[in-house]
Amino acid sequence: MKTIEEINQLNVKKILSEKKIPDFFPGDVIKVGVRITEGKKDRIQYFEGVCIARKNRDINSSFTVRKISFGEGVERTFPLYGTVIDTITVIRHGKVRRAKLYYLRDRTGKSARIAEKIRKKIGIEVDVKPEMVTEETLAPVAAEAEKQTEVQAEPKIEKSEEKK
């Protein structure tokens, strides 16, 4: 018999196989696409703001996004694995030292800004596209290589003749 935790973990794996959820943390500016049904029509409404909290509770995980709209602070809490979430996009990463940024509720203007976190890239990103190697693709490369060797060899001969 499966426990509730095992069932929740299976559901999380199933949801993650269907849609990709990016890594984001409190302080990051994110754009959440929310699926809204009005009558028979479905549309996507975007909510962009600063992630001020994230709760990791298996299938019950959620996050709170805060934005300032027409001078008023608006906060919205979303279920991380909910069906209403269409997309989550990280706009920029914020540099903070707290897990919950509830202190931003009391601040406005410049004091509510969060510095951008600069992430160092480790390693070299190489985009390799496999191509079929055939005689047709090798012929132009071989011809150019022969021309370069001929051009390099000729000036050396001329210089040696001039010295004599």
UniProtKB/Swiss-Prot annotation:
Region annotation Disordered: where it falls in the sequence: 144-164
The gene coding this protein: rplS
Top-level taxon of the source organism: Bacteria
One Gene Ontology MF term: structural constituent of ribosome
Organism for this UniProt entry: Pelagibacter ubique (strain HTCC1062)
Residues making up the signal peptide according to the UniProt record: none
A GO CC annotation given for this chain: cytosolic large ribosomal subunit
Protein name (record): Large ribosomal subunit protein bL19
Similarity comment: Belongs to the bacterial ribosomal protein bL19 family.
